[in-house]
């Protein structure tokens, strides 16, 4: 399951190159998701990614937010 999620993230990243960047964090949310799933597996990695996406909004401070 993790490999499928990682492939979907890579597919998203491939197509998102053609849109303006909107993530205020470093690494970007998609890269964070890829790292989290690769490190923690499908379930915990997806949970961390969803929490990160919820924090990524125009009123957030942004900045460095590495995978724990």
Curated annotation (Swiss-Prot):
<keyword id="KW-0472">Membrane</keyword>
<comment type="function">
    <text>Could be involved in insertion of integral membrane proteins into the membrane.</text>
</comment>
<dbReference type="InterPro" id="IPR002696">
    <property type="entry name" value="Membr_insert_effic_factor_YidD"/>
</dbReference>
<dbReference type="GO" id="GO:0005886">
    <property type="term" value="C:plasma membrane"/>
</dbReference>
<comment type="similarity">
    <text>Belongs to the UPF0161 family.</text>
</comment>
<keyword id="KW-1003">Cell membrane</keyword>
<dbReference type="Pfam" id="PF01809">
    <property type="entry name" value="YidD"/>
</dbReference>
<protein>
    <recommendedName>
        <fullName>Putative membrane protein insertion efficiency factor</fullName>
    </recommendedName>
</protein>
